[in-house]
């Protein structure tokens, strides 16, 4: 394993909540910029709004970190209640992804929009139907891969990276639409 990868794994293992905050703050803003570049829509955040937006993304990273831990425990409890004693890691990852994106995902997305509205002084929930649909065609497959990783510490960072990918896909779709 390369030195930088090992350094990353050490940092996210040692400081999981701080790492979740920073990863989402940085990658969330990068996703906003990529989506705006693809759609041709200019982002005009002053420094104060920029910091508020980063704060919002960072808080979302903390919520996702806790949500992933909770959904892992939930999936283990379902296995226990159904007396599933064996099964593939991929099955567990798929079930955890399905539970996460069915029970946790919609509320997290609505919270994220509410938080954006609050921090940026905007209103509205336009486009939430499209966002919710991504849970099934994008996030369940993406998180199945994410949750199949043996190192749970890197899952939040990968989720933040998946957000960049989704932003790019949606930006291209909006541009063509």
Residue ranges and their predicted role:
Residues 1-177:
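Juxtamembrane/disordered regions of integral membrane proteins
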